[in-house]
Amino acid sequence: MKREVIRLPHDALWLLQTLRAAGHSAYVVGGCVRDSLLGRTPGDWDICTSARPDQTRALFADRQLILTGARHGTVGVVLHGRPYEITTYRQDGDYRDHRHPETVRFVQDLAGDLARRDFTINAMAYAPGEGVIDLHGGRRDLAEGIIRCVGDPAARFAEDALRILRAMRFAARLEFTLDPATAAAALAACDTLQTVSAERIYAELDGLLAAPGAGATMDRYGAVLAGAVPEIAPCIGCGQPGRWHCYDVWRHTAAAVGALDLRGQDTRGARVLCWAAFLHDIAKPPCKTVGPDGAAHFRGHNQRGAQMARTILLRLKAPAYLVEGAVGLVAIHDAPLPVGDASILKALNRCGPVFLRRLCALKYADLDAHAPTVEVVSRRAEVSAFEARMTQLAKEGCYTIRQLAVNGSDLMDAGVRAGPEVGRKLHLLLRAVMEGRVPNTRDALLAALREL
């Protein structure tokens, strides 16, 4: 069998060689091996070793060290500004609160260390000359696109409930599925996610939502994710009979997240959009009514959804910019778009072009998750027309006081008394320009000033 060769960064290779030259065994381990086998560039290169923490510290005493994890066997060594974690082979004792082991026992063999890890694809090690050490079928699961716990999945999730969300995130990131036993154990244990800190839950969900397989993962494992965000549960199976929809609320939500086009969005914008899509219809179940024709209606779900989204995001301790951005989008995601230059300019004044571009992206994804009817195609064309005109007006139009051809000094020179009256007059002039009643030229504005 051909032995895989992983190209290690120079510093990671030097660390391995230094540990081995001192008589210790050492391997790169975990995600760097997984990503290398997938042809991806690893973000971190972690090392496991038989060296005890004090031995590692002594060996690299002339380097900058990070010792915050030394009690649990991890010593960070900083080389050329980049930290490398070197962790002693260990086995975890009994876990408390579904998150942290009571004790950590250092061991001398790699096999014992790999057996404590979460998933088979993360339980592989590598060293030059030895190749990949795979004791749990990680390579097979990589080839088959499977997320599988090492050993008994129920035991792994009982030890650390956050592993449930890590399984979801890896499935979304790699576009894999959970093996049946792992999926069943995750569902059985999902209520224990309520014991995990809000910050940890937020970080895992944030990574999941930004991943290429987010929509498919949400569709498959919504009941598991409801352990982290209980408001999801009523959305699952909540029907939407009528001509607009072909999915229940949850499957529509998953499809919308999967349909998001994040091209052109910066990092913050992409995160805001992912969370807005995730929560945009969260209030549909409590707002649902069914008309005499059997069609479902969800009146008021925009505003109620914004309230629920704010509650959820604050509970998860999301960043303030994300809370405000996502809640703002949820609040108007289903509202009609402005028509006509005056209305579009006023929307630019009120919301700004960045928000409106995000709103268009959310509306596209929302519509793409509807039934492919003539009405939906027409509404998508309306969004496209709005986006094109809004983009043009954002470049060429006047929608802020700063863009007016006159300023406060010009008004005072024209006889307006200094103070609040200057601001009031500027706002009136801006409105006149946005409504097309006055051209945005100095002479026209000063002439209009006399009539205000």
Each model region followed by its residue ranges:
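Catalytic cores of the polymerase beta-like nucleotidyltransferase superfamily
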Residues: 1-452
